[in-house]
């Protein structure tokens, strides 16, 4: 049985968007692209490692930086220019990204 990630971290300011169900994707680089569809993952804050909620991974798809569009911004619950700026700050000079789609597990 292959192991798969069971934890994912988000900036604290994004966690209310996740727990409200507004944010349904995350864009990551290849090092964080190994999530497996139909698995449950615990969400923690990056800054304080506080558990926030659980999500179910729906899909993991390759995405180039220049393909990020209004649809992704809507799913991220952030305006497109802000989203692109944030991605560039986190992953400078990386164009090969992955979009991870998920849903909130309501307990």
Curated annotation (Swiss-Prot):
InterPro entries, sorted: AC4CH, ASCH_domain, PUA-like_sf
Family statement drawn from the similarity comment of this UniProt entry: Belongs to the N(4)-acetylcytidine amidohydrolase family.
Superkingdom of the organism of origin: Bacteria
UniProt-recorded name of the protein: N(4)-acetylcytidine amidohydrolase
Domain ASCH positions: 9-105
One GO cellular component term noted in the UniProt record for this chain: cytosol
Keywords of the record: Hydrolase
């Amino acid at each position: 049985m292959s192991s798969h990630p069971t934890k994912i971290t988000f900036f604290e300011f994004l966690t209310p968007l996740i727990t409200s169900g507004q944010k349904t994707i995350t864009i990551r680089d290849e090092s964080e692209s190994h999530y497996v569809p139909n698995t449950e993952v615990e969400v923690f804050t990056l800054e304080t490692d506080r558990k926030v909620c659980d999500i179910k991974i729906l899909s993991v798809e390759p995405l180039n930086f220049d393909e990020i569009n209004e649809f992704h911004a809507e799913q991220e619950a952030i305006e497109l220019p802000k989203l692109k700026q944030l991605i560039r700050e986190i992953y400078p000079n990386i164009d090969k990204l992955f979009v991870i789609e998920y849903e909130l597990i309501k307990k």
